[in-house]
Amino acid sequence: MSQGFRGPTGVFPHQTQSYLDPSHEHSKWRYPQPQGPESYPRSFQLQQIEFLKGRLPEAPLIGIQTQSLPPFLPGHWPRFPGPPAQDRQLEIWEFPRSVTLRNQGFHIGPPLPPPHSRGTPWRGADGLCSHFRELSISQSPEQKVLNRLEELGEGKATTAHVLARELRIPKRDINRILYSLEKKGKLHRGRGKPPLWSLVPLSQAWTQPPGVVNPDSCIQEFPRGEPGLDSEDGDPASDLEGPSEPLDMAEIKEKICDYLFNVSNSSALNLAKNIGLTKARDVTSVLIDLERQGDVYRQGATPPIWYLTDKKRERLQMKRSTHSAPAPTPTAVPEATRSPSFPACHPPPAGASSSVAASKRVENGQEPAIKHESRHEARPGPMRLRPHAYHNGPSRAGYVASENGQWATDDIPDNLNSIHTAPGEFRAIMEMPSFYSPTLPRCSPYKKLTECQLKNPVSGLLEYAQFTSQTCDFNLIEQSGPSHEPRFKFQVVINGREFPPAEAGSKKVAKQDAAVKAMAILLREAKAKDSGQPEDLSHCPMEEDSEKPAEAQAPSSSATSLFSGKSPVTTLLECMHKLGNSCEFRLLSKEGPAHDPKFQYCVAVGAQTFPPVSAPSKKVAKQMAAEEAMKALQEEAASSADDQSGGANTDSLDESMAPNKIRRIGELVRYLNTNPVGGLLEYARSHGFAAEFKLIDQSGPPHEPKFVYQAKVGGRWFPAVCAHSKKQGKQDAADAALRVLIGESEKAEQLGFAEVTPVTGASLRRTMLLLSRSPDAHPKTLPLSGSTFHDQIAMLSHRCFNALTNSFQPSLLGRKILAAIIMKRDPEDMGVVVSLGTGNRCVKGDSLSLKGETVNDCHAEIISRRGFIRFLYSELMKYNHHTAKNSIFELARGGEKLQIKKTVSFHLYISTAPCGDGALFDKSCSDRAVESTESRHYPVFENPKQGKLRTKVENGEGTIPVESSDIVPTWDGIRLGERLRTMSCSDKILRWNVLGLQGALLTHFLQPVYLKSVTLGYLFSQGHLTRAICCRVTRDGKAFEDGLRYPFIVNHPKVGRVSVYDSKRQSGKTKETSVNWCMADGYDLEILDGTRGTVDGPGKELSRVSKKNIFLQFKKLCSFRARRDLLQLSYGEAKKAARDYDLAKNYFKKSLRDMGYGNWISKPQEEKNFYLCPVPND
């Protein structure tokens, strides 16, 4: 057995006495030491090693004249005896798991006797030494990996799989070790899959970014001739990755607190995304930990909103404002698993490079350093290295021993240790002026308020409060009103000072208004203080501010009170959008050089132009122009309110222009012609309501589910609807709610008409009478300024359809195309809808009827025209030459037929471009709505494909061109599967402009009836539309028109589009249902299945617009007019009997073929050969 331990400098005997009285001299316990300049420090370090290994009973001391080394753990460790060796023989090699940290020391193993007591020496050291040769220390997995990579040589790399096979360590452990060593800066990971791992080159030891501590750079390499220390001091538990998690946790906590300090509150998901994480669960545990520490608190349940506590916010505020040096590292670690932390190391000076070398091995007990806050703010000092706690090396001054034997100033860098500072330096640091001291330069409160005023009012006020180190709260004083129209009153409180409250329909707006009021008062006070006015004049009582909010605002903040945190341009556009008016920013002039331009802008709303303004940029000029327009509008609203209420002032422009008080023509058209969901949400928002959709029920198999949805607007539930998809269910529910809401609330007087009762299904007859029959029931023109002729046509169409569908049916819901024909008795007449229809489908080939019982084409334009024919039949049945004054007819030339009076005109409205040639253009060709008295057409002929005849797709949407060859559809061919061909709506409107709307049968009694105008709501291009509906046939001049016989002509109607809204493209297919109505039907709607051509329902009833029913009307009219020669004819023979019409139709088809547009495709002749029994004259 060896009698001593051979160290690097000599042989030391084993010490058997374990405890000594404190009164003994330290010199009695000095060991024999070799001679040399570094013998004493090396022997002292060896004594530390012997003590930590349990071979010495007492911690060694070092005099003040000598230098000490950093301890293994932070804190002041007192001198105390060690436990018996036999009790801790199994624990000494797992030191980190059994250590218990105290405030004044640490303890291993069983309880220790008090330092002042005496006891017999422990006799376990000899036993430990006697079995010392039998003990061995295995290398840690990290050390094995580093050794293996070192054996490969510098610049050589390998994969994790190879390392796992060679070292016989599981691959997942190898991966963990490799990434841990990479984080510590010891390994380099190359690109590729799998990555190649290699040692970090020695040249990169000092190239790490600032703030990153490389543990290797803090350790000196020992001579290769002394490998004993490396093997003796090995501790497998020291290289575990335990500290990495607390370090990440601390960094996440710091980021969370910093983010919550900048924003008042946030959800867990928002927090995670703003600090670099992805999911809420990544920060949930950290937030709960911070909540236990009293740093954050939460409100709400799903999901909770997190806030900083007031104490934590104050601490962060003080920390940010003082800019003081970072606090020293704590002297004790509260957790048993916490590893020591070392300050960042710096590269040595050039002169010391020869004595310092970076270690290539992972030393025992080495851990990454803790990241200190505000490390970059520490004043720079000389670059020096700190030796590792276990190994020999040159020490430095600054670690002195106190009288009680403690290791003083552990782990505190010299540049942060106030013990060694010069006299008075510590006091100078503590008495450093704060950030808000008047001696430091910073902007004035008035300047800061001016900057904050340009931001959102709430954000600006909070920023100003933070700037002045004040607390700012928004208190909810009162909440009133029903659930569908609540009112919230908020008040701003800054450091206990209360400001005037503000009330609005939402919490957000109320907070903004309250912030605007508080900001205006603070701005006025700060301005008065800067101008030198007495301070008592700048402060106004809260009562005066609350009673006179307009006087409390400075002139410079008047615009802010108008816009409630939004830009002037946005606010103006929103107001005009609510009012249904168009707003335009006009550039009047541009002056000045390129480096200093001047732009002059003005705002034009309808026919009204507001004062121009100039600014150095277009953006600023537009904002200033919008501000001038808003001020002018507010003055007009205030003056009108004074005239009506005797001088009562309105609080804001929004209230004076409340949409529930003033509604315009564009609102109805805009909401009914947009996407149903978007239209309902916009309608609800503009009226101050909240809208939502709720899934009531779900049933049916997975391949054919049924969803029942219900809309809720302003606390009111609307009828439920059923659909086969959730998207369609929401759209149908929105359509139903929108139709009911507008139908109930819309009144004629609110649209500028005389007093008319609300248009509902029950009062439709009276409404139509008031709008069409009574000359005194309505004004001659629409009084709305800015509305165009086409706007009036569109309004009448949608208003009539909305009134008819007030008591909705589920089959009416969803996206649809609307067409209507409006009649005007004279040019000054407002007009009345005489026929309307919806739909976008054609009949299937297997649903054709030989008896005329199906409607072949259910597109909206065709259905409205068939309804118009029924309206003409009803008017003809009422015609009497004695009462012809009230009729729309008059005798034509020759007296044999009737004709439409010259003052009566008919106008067609379609909510979108007609299918076929009229819709074949892209968005860039769309024209804006322009009110023009010129009716001249400018058709577009850009390529030979334009103008071609097209047919509709069977059981679908869209059109395809006809073939050039002759096509004769046959009944049996279609029944056997041949494609059914139906001409497009553009082609049929072209035929109406040549042959008339009345058709062949009515030509027996009437002269041709032509359209006066065509109005579109969407997809309007004047050149493409005019080419499609009339100008195709006159492309080569008047040759075609000259070939027509009297009374047929080529009619060129006036065309235009709606201007009060801009419809957006709606996705999804239209429904198969089709609605038809004419004035003769009262308020009775008929709903068809467009693919079957019959009434929608199980009975498949005959439609009133079918060939059979129209032919029945014709037979009644023949009997009434004593045209018995026509009663015995079939449907096809009666049409051919109209000789003039038949000749003109054949000429029209032949001309289209000759012009190269293609062949007109008709239905099989077999379906026109049905008869009806003669109808007796009633």
From Swiss-Prot:
A Gene Ontology biological process in which this protein takes part is: apoptotic process
One Pfam family hit: dsrm
Task: Say which domain of life the source belongs to.
Answer: Eukaryota
Q: Which InterPro entries match?
A: A_deamin, ADAR1_DSRM_1, ADAR1_DSRM_3, dsRBD_dom, WH-like_DNA-bd_sf, WH_DNA-bd_sf, Z_dom
In UniProt terms, what is the effect of altering residue 120 to P? In strain: Czech II
Residue ranges, annotated region (N-terminal extension of DRBM 3 and constituent of a bi-partite nuclear localization signal): 665-674
The record's catalysed reaction(s) read: adenosine in double-stranded RNA + H2O + H(+) = inosine in double-stranded RNA + NH4(+)
Q: Keywords on this record?
A: Antiviral defense, Cytoplasm, DNA-binding, Hydrolase, Immunity, Innate immunity, Isopeptide bond, Metal-binding, Methylation, mRNA processing, Nucleus, Phosphoprotein, Repeat, RNA-binding, RNA-mediated gene silencing, Transcription, Transcription regulation, Ubl conjugation, Zinc
User: Crosslink site(s) for Glycyl lysine isopeptide (Lys-Gly) (interchain with G-Cter in SUMO2)?
Assistant: 371, 824
Modification Phosphoserine, positions: 231, 238, 434, 567, 582, 589, 763, 772, 774
Modification Asymmetric dimethylarginine occurs at: 30, 42
Numbered residues of crosslink Glycyl lysine isopeptide (Lys-Gly) (interchain with G-Cter in SUMO):
371
Which residue ranges are recorded for the region named Disordered? Answer: 1-40, 221-244, 316-383, 527-564, 631-657
UniProt biased composition (Polar residues): 554-564
GO MF terms here are: adenosine deaminase activity; double-stranded RNA adenosine deaminase activity; left-handed Z-DNA binding; metal ion binding; RNA binding
Task: Provide ranges: composition bias, Basic and acidic residues.
Answer: 360-379, 527-550
Region annotated Interaction with Z-DNA, chain positions: 135-204
Q: According to its record, what are the GO cellular component terms?
A: cytoplasm; nucleolus; nucleoplasm; nucleus; supraspliceosomal complex
Q: What does this protein do?
A: Catalyzes the hydrolytic deamination of adenosine to inosine in double-stranded RNA (dsRNA) referred to as A-to-I RNA editing.
Entry remark concerning the domains of this protein: The third dsRNA-binding domain (DRBM 3) contains an additional N-terminal alpha-helix that is part of a bi-partite nuclear localization signal, together with the sequence immediately C-terminal to DRBM 3. The presence of DRBM 3 is important to bring together the N-terminal and the C-terminal part of the bi-partite nuclear localization signal for import mediated by TNPO1. RNA binding interferes with nuclear import.
Q: What is this protein called?
A: Double-stranded RNA-specific adenosine deaminase
Q: Per the UniProt entry, what species is this protein from, by scientific name?
A: Mus musculus (Mouse)
